[in-house]
């Protein structure tokens, strides 16, 4: 058995991710198998140490190093192997080398950087990505500091205070209860540019890591049945944030008329969007503004990506009803790109996102719950289109 283990270790140490080019499903399966193997081999003592000490300390050190500008300075200098003293000088802040020495050891132990010799380190591709502003990785990581970690730490106390009942009220969530402002997630983002930046950056990084929805939903069939004469809209991305999902539609269908794709979000969000195509136009719209209906009527499709999972079932029904009111019978579709929790075997990604949004009194949904939400909104469920990775699906619905 020892010989088999040694052979396996040797093979794993020479594994290059380049062999999975164009085979992401295979890469993902191997990563999940490796994760399962890790948890199988880990003892209860090791797991306790990792959960209680290693993981929270690792991220706090990573955030501190990002704040010093180390990764940014390292990337700007071309990367490369450096000693601790050199790295201290590359930092944007005046960092004591001895302090840096302690923290770099932990980064190397967690494969954020590589230890090449005593007091010498080289950046991994991920470390360089943290230092590259164009990737938005560094501000995306800050979502944990700004939003996720404080709320997660408050979660046990919140549940005790609410007698261990599932939170369903958007206005009385754990998130609101966590912070002194007593504001919802989106209200805090609107009030603080730093909080908005970490959220927007995370959404950008998160979206780029997902499979583009036109790859697993037939947008060509949707287009074939569309009437785009007289400026009629093709797809309205409701709460579309940065517009990446519409960009993917534009890339797949380069002959779409100008303005046929509509990006809808709050005024400050669409005001910060920089689009590189005339096929997409922006419309400022607040889903919750009293007395204001959906401004784009009779579109071929109303698309929402990771929008409804931010809200309770009751609020999600209200959002869908607002859209249903302006849909064209027999023509318009609602396309919900979101997590569909399987009845068994939910992935860590799916289950973690479920518990994350639960802290905002929302939840991810099973097929049964999605069916009820859609029916309660006066719509008819047509079909689920899974992404093939076990992350998300496109849920198609229409007027009955």
Curated annotation (Swiss-Prot):
Which PROSITE patterns does this UniProt record tie to the protein? SAM_OMT_II
Keywords attached to this Swiss-Prot or TrEMBL record, sorted alphabetically, are: Methyltransferase, S-adenosyl-L-methionine, Transferase
Question: Biotechnology applications of this protein?
Answer: Fumagillin and its derivatives have been intensely studied for their potential use in the treatment of amebiasis, microsporidiosis and rheumatoid arthritis. They have also interesting antiangiogenic properties by the irreversible inhibition of human type 2 methionine aminopeptidase (METAP2).
- After gene disruption, what is the outcome? Completely abolishes the production of fumagillin.
Q: Name one Pfam family in it.
A: Methyltransf_2
* Residues binding substrate: 145-158
Which amino acids does the record list as binding S-adenosyl-L-methionine?
A: 239-240, 265, 286-287
**Biological role:** O-methyltransferase; part of the gene cluster that mediates the biosynthesis of fumagillin, a meroterpenoid that has numerous biological activities including irreversible inhibition of human type 2 methionine aminopeptidase (METAP2).
User: What is the protein name given in its UniProt record?
Assistant: O-methyltransferase af390-400
Q: What is the lineage of its organism?
A: Eukaryota, Fungi, Dikarya, Ascomycota, Pezizomycotina
């Amino acid at each position: 058995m020892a010989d088999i283990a040694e052979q396996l270790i040797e093979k794993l140490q020479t594994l290059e991710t380049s062999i999975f080019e164009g085979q992401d499903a295979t890469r993902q399966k191997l990563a999940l198998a490796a994760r399962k193997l890790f948890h199988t081999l880990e003892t209860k003592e090791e797991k306790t140490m990792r959960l209680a000490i290693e993981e929270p300390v690792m991220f706090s050190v990573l955030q501190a190093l990002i704040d010093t500008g180390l990764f940014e300075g390292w990337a700007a200098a071309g990367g490369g192997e450096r000693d601790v003293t050199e790295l201290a000088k590359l930092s944007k802040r005046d960092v004591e080398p001895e302090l840096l020495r302690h923290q770099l050891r932990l980064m190397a132990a967690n494969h954020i950087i590589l230890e090449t010799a005593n007091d010498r380190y080289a950046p991994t591709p991920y470390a360089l990505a943290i230092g590259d502003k164009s990737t938005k990785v560094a501000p995306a990581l800050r979502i944990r500091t700004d939003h996720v970690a404080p709320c997660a730490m408050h979660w046990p106390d919140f549940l005790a205070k609410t007698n261990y009942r599932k939170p369903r009220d958007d206005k009385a969530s754990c998130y609101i209860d966590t912070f002194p402002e007593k504001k919802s997630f989106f209200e805090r983002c609107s009030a603080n540019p730093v909080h908005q930046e970490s959220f927007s950056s995370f959404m950008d990084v998160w979206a780029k890591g997902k499979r583009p929805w036109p790859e697993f939903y037939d947008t060509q069939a949707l287009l074939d049945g569309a009437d785009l004469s007289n400026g009629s809209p093709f797809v309205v991305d409701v709460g579309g944030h940065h517009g990446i999902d519409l960009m993917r539609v534009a890339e797949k269908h380069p002959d779409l008329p100008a303005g046929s794709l509509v990006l809808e979000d709050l005024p400050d969000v669409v005001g910060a969007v920089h689009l590189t195509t005339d096929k997409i136009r922006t419309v400022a719209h607040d889903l919750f503004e009293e007395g204001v209906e959906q401004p784009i009527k009779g579109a071929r499709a109303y698309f929402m990506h990771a929008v409804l999972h931010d809200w309770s079932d009751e609020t999600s029904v209200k959002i869908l009803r607002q859209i249903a009111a302006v849909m064209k019978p027999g023509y318009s579709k609602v396309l919900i790109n979101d997590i569909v929790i399987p009845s068994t075997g939910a992935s860590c990604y799916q289950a973690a996102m479920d518990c994350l949004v639960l802290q905002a009194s929302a939840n991810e949904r099973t097929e049964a719950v999605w069916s009820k939400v859609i029916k309660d909104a006066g719509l008819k469920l047509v079909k689920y289109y899974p992404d093939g990775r076990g992350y998300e699906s496109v849920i198609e619905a229409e007027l009955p």
